[in-house]
Amino acid sequence: MTKAKKLIEVAMPIKEISAESVRDKSIRHGHISTLHLWWARRPLPVCRAVIFASLVPDPLDEQCPQAFRDAIQELLGNDPLYAPYPDIPYTAIYDPMPDNLRNRLLMFIGKFSPVCQANMLKGKSTASKEQLSEGCLIKWESKNDKAVLAKARKLIWTAYNAEQNPDISFIALSQSFDAAYQAIEEAESNLYSCIDRHLETDTIKEKETALQVAIDSFQSQMPSVFDPFAGGGAIPLEAARLGCRSYGNDINPVAHIIEKGSVEFPQKYGKPIRYTEEEFRRIYGKEGVDLLIAKGISICNGIIDIPNRLSFDVEYYAKQLLAMTEKEVGYLYPADENGNKPIAYYWARTATCSNPSCKAEVPLLKQFYLANTSTKKVYLNPVINGTDIQFEIKEGTCPIKEGWNKTGNLTCPCCGSVTTSKQVKEQSCESQLKEKFIAAIVESHDGKKYQLPSIDLLLPHIDYHNEFIPLEMMTKQTDLISSRGWGINQWYQMFSNRQLYMLQAFIKNFSILKNKIESTQYA
């Protein structure tokens, strides 16, 4: 029997998906992009739309199961929210959209709001948050909308099971979906209502098994989604959000860790947990109680309810890690005379001018801006006295258009001589490049401030035999790592002494903290 074409093969709400994807790039709070930078991250609206449209058939296809048509009619057909456009807002002529099941399904994926439609017809713009209607699958706010996600999951459930059994009715499929979904909710309630469930008693193990059985039973009747090049994890994440059993793989270890952090661990550990006050204090101590107060979580009748265990623990242990590391290396980052703590130090490597009569130590700067935005422009203005190069900090547009380091060649601001890229690399290979502390960026009550160095920063002693120093040799293929050819042959050489000292302290304290976490916490 010929199968119906999938919706993605026939039609997609491209304009709507594009609009929400542009918005997706600017969302920060709660977005997986804030976990770790990944250079080829796919927009979540695109992934959600593509996965959904790949799993459901075109309802106007002759081979589409009747149960799926009935599902659209029941779930979307009577809701004016999913009514097709009376006049498609992005076409140049009057263009009414037929009210049929396919278009209803497209409007469920993404539909411009009435305000946006009116503005588009008038040639006006609309704020990104207000472009799509509430209740659309791809809208950011729908990520945790139980009603919207339930519709999407039931449609996928119906499409998947009706394809295998074309004679089954939507009523029967709807009832089986509701029963399977309710079984998961009941199993979750039974498990997450238990007090001190991190202690693995026989009762807790039984309830954990019951929950896993309910989830497996549900997902056995849903399609599986596999992304062999998962990268930032957007496709596995959205497949899981739609109720499917999702699989992701990537050969890059950074991608693998990102996928663990964005897809696997939140699903496994990001659940509610209840503690007795005694057990909570035993695990978290006074610092944990302080965090409870800061988050507005109260102790009620000796019971503490944490809405999301993983979120709480990440914040708690992150504060512990930062406090331990700051205690050890904080003296390397002293506050200024006004008590403002540094956010960052701006250093530059310096090379020696190749002119024998000059020999100035020139910072390898490609540009002079410390801040260059539409609202704030701060730059370094060179002050040259003979072969001595210093800087002052000024606000406004920098009059110097190009830096002294251009395509690797260094132009000396003292004598005008050019030190070629080859000569600069030779100095680097012979360890002749030095470091110059140029500016400090501090956090004040008025925001970021930029200051000239007012202190001599101590360079810490580094034990290069320390187990936390990466002494491994780098690959010799220069096309894989851009630092090759500069005398950088081992990974630790990518960092300054200060950076190495801070990083080794960070890793050491992380290991200490990791060993303090009980095996029952995150098995």
Where are the regions that the model predicts?
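S-adenosyl-L-methionine-dependent nucleic acid methyltransferase catalytic domains
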Residues: 1-523
